[in-house]
């Protein structure tokens, strides 16, 4: 089934966030998840390896927070970074 425009946009946001998380952890984004996996996440499918094991710890839980509006890519003087509501340093 085709994604809705909103699901496509959410997948793009998740992909951006995944790239930032991967860069932060010095790992290739593809080692964490494929775009297909992110599309599944954007459609509400929670049965993905991205939410389990080391992938879940490194990226999955944060990506769920992105979907809930608790984390988002932020533009800063040093470029893009992923900021979360509980990370006080992202507010300054």
Model-derived features: where do they sit?
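Accessory DNA-binding and partner-docking regions appended to nucleic-acid-acting proteins
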Residues: 1-92
């Amino acid at each position: 089934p085709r994604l809705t425009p909103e699901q496509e946009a959410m997948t793009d946001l998740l992909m951006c966030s995944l790239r930032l998380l991967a860069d932060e952890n010095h790992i290739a984004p593809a080692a964490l998840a494929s775009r297909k996996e992110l599309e599944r996440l954007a459609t509400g499918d929670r049965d993905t390896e991205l939410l389990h094991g080391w992938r879940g710890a490194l990226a999955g839980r944060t990506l769920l927070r992105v979907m809930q509006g608790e984390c988002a890519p932020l533009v800063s003087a040093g470029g893009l970074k992923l900021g979360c509501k509980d990370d006080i340093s992202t507010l300054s």
